[in-house]
Amino acid sequence: MPQLDTSTWFTTILSMFLTLFIIFQLKISKHTYHPNPETTLPMTQKQPTPWETKWTKIYSPLSLPLQS
């Protein structure tokens, strides 16, 4: 069974990493960024809840009229 020749692996792997690095650098350099990024606060709109729009009365058992 023949031996696996690994003498060119270092060159192949190194050239692959170099190529990937160059490709990613080119992709990143073409990306457009905002000139002045500012944090914007989201505009929160307060939704009225049903219990805020109408008056409700909570009856406790002690305030109910006595039933005979």
Curated annotation (Swiss-Prot):
Bilayer-crossing residues are 8-24
Subcellular localization, as worded in the UniProt entry = Mitochondrion membrane
Q: Does the keyword Membrane apply?
A: yes
Give the UniProt entry's GO cellular component terms: mitochondrial membrane; proton-transporting ATP synthase complex
Q: Show the InterPro entries listed in the entry.
A: ATP8_mammal (IPR039017), ATP8_metazoa (IPR001421)
Signal peptide as annotated in the record: none
**One annotated GO molecular function:** proton transmembrane transporter activity
Coarse class of the primary localization is mitochondrion
How does this protein sit in the membrane? Single-pass membrane protein
N6-acetyllysine occurs at which residues? K54, K57
Instruction: Kindly list the cysteine pairs connected by disulfide bridges.
Output: none
Show the Pfam families listed in the entry: ATP-synt_8 (PF00895)
Which top-level group of life is the source organism from?
Eukaryota
Q: What role does this protein play?
A: Subunit 8, of the mitochondrial membrane ATP synthase complex (F(1)F(0) ATP synthase or Complex V) that produces ATP from ADP in the presence of a proton gradient across the membrane which is generated by electron transport complexes of the respiratory chain. ATP synthase complex consist of a soluble F(1) head domain - the catalytic core - and a membrane F(1) domain - the membrane proton channel. These two domains are linked by a central stalk rotating inside the F(1) region and a stationary peripheral stalk.
Query: Subunit notes for this chain?
Result: Component of the ATP synthase complex composed at least of ATP5F1A/subunit alpha, ATP5F1B/subunit beta, ATP5MC1/subunit c (homooctomer), MT-ATP6/subunit a, MT-ATP8/subunit 8, ATP5ME/subunit e, ATP5MF/subunit f, ATP5MG/subunit g, ATP5MK/subunit k, ATP5MJ/subunit j, ATP5F1C/subunit gamma, ATP5F1D/subunit delta, ATP5F1E/subunit epsilon, ATP5PF/subunit F6, ATP5PB/subunit b, ATP5PD/subunit d, ATP5PO/subunit OSCP.
What is the protein's name according to its record? ATP synthase F(0) complex subunit 8
Q: What organism is listed for this UniProt entry?
A: Hippopotamus amphibius
